[in-house]
Amino acid sequence: LLSDARAEAVESSVSELERLAISHDASHYLLVPAGLVRPDSAEDVANIFRAAGDLGLPLTFRSGGTSLSGQSSGDGLMVDTRRHFKKIEVLEDGKKVRVQPGATIMMVNNYLAPYGYKLGPDPASWSACTIGGVVANNSSGMSSGTKYNTYNTLDSMVLVLPSGTIIDTAEPDADQKLRSLEPELHEGLLRLRKRVLENPESMAKIRQQYSMKNTMGYGLNSLVDFETPVDILQHLLIGSEGTLGFVASATYRTLPILKNISTGLLVFDNLIDAARSVPELVANKLATVELMDATSIRVAQRTGQAAEALAAIDVKDHAALLVEFQGNSEQELSDLAAAAAPMFKSLPVASPVSMTSKLSERNALWAARRGLYTTVAGNRRSGTNALLEDVVVPVEVLGNTCSDLTKLFDSHGYQDSVIFGHAKDGNIHFMLNEQFRDPKQLDRYRDF
């Protein structure tokens, strides 16, 4: 296959050094690929798909490698898209943008900023994560929630199927082309949609599950939300972790940049009080509500660069919520703050609520949250693995969920665990540090 790739002028390598170098990503898995290719077009990928299919060789696509779950690792053929798939094309004066999978969120937003727009997805790893992974994981982030994730802001994509078929879903005849080139797939998607629509219980379950952040399995909501197979297919690829095909480019509908913003840190005596305050904050139109537990705060303080509001906390069992109002104008921002004032006074906070619109102060607060995972993971005991889980529950039961988690940590001896995340969406991360070379520690992890 690599000989064929070289004949087609596609970069390829079986060098042990290169294979070892690309085997490392942000996860704790280590799988060394058998070979490496760096295509520079959708047609190259189509040819690689066909050749790999003939040989029964599995493919893994790799862009930023920032996922903590190991999706960018594999021991078959590694298809590296970081070098040649970085094109960014601003469309309609910034209202849309066409992006290839090797471009980072930060790169795209830098292109869009002069037009006053940005992408919807805003993960904490925005400076390093790439569009390929953002599509493959249906990434959202701090304020995008489910409303502005890739699934809900995608306009079209150029996709490559394992058969080598290339479809540009923006073309008027895209669905006809799919039916002509992939009749079995086209018909199968229609049958699946019909099956779901004829089952009210399935419909209700899908609606309920996808009212929250949900990237478990394939995006079955596409069978409910879209009618044509080509629309269903392109939305099934979102969140499919690279298992259904390759996204050679994605065109997004963008969001206007709101310049009227105020940010604050709400400090609580304990995690449960903080978590149980979230529904009220959501009801009062806070654009972001980010949770940090006591361990998160301590780690942020130890960097020596924590914002004044964070550095001032005498941490015991405290927790904090980083919150933000966003408005189209100063008046809208003022109205949001005024409407929420009675709610702020009713919260069981440990210190007075203070909001700031100063960019330097806001950036200092956000720096602690955006760098939280790397800072916490970097402070773990030597020889341990940082294991991050990602769960979502209805916001109304977030407090009970955090309470149950802390009891689990205590009962299994995970005193150094951390809870943080996107509380506005009921989406929290918790981190365990474990030493897997010790059989007893492995048993503890299994029991947990």
Predicted features along the sequence, with ranges:
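Generic non-transmembrane alpha-helical segments
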Residues: 1-9, 47-55, 111, 276-285, ...
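N-terminal flexible segment immediately upstream of the FAD-binding catalytic core
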Residues: 1-54, 64-95, 124, 172, ...
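N-terminal glycine-rich flavin-associated loop
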Residues: 27-59, 81-123, 139-191, 256-269, ...
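Short, hydrophobic/aliphatic alpha-helical segments
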Residues: 44-58, 112-129, 217-237, 364-367, ...
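Extended, hydrophobic alpha-helical segments in both membrane/secreted and soluble proteins
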Residues: 59-61, 68, 264, 274, ...
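C-terminal substrate-binding/cap subdomain adjacent to the FAD-binding core in PCMH-type
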Residues: 134-136, 143-147, 154-370, 374, ...
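Signature for HUH/AEP ssDNA processing cores
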Residues: 379-406
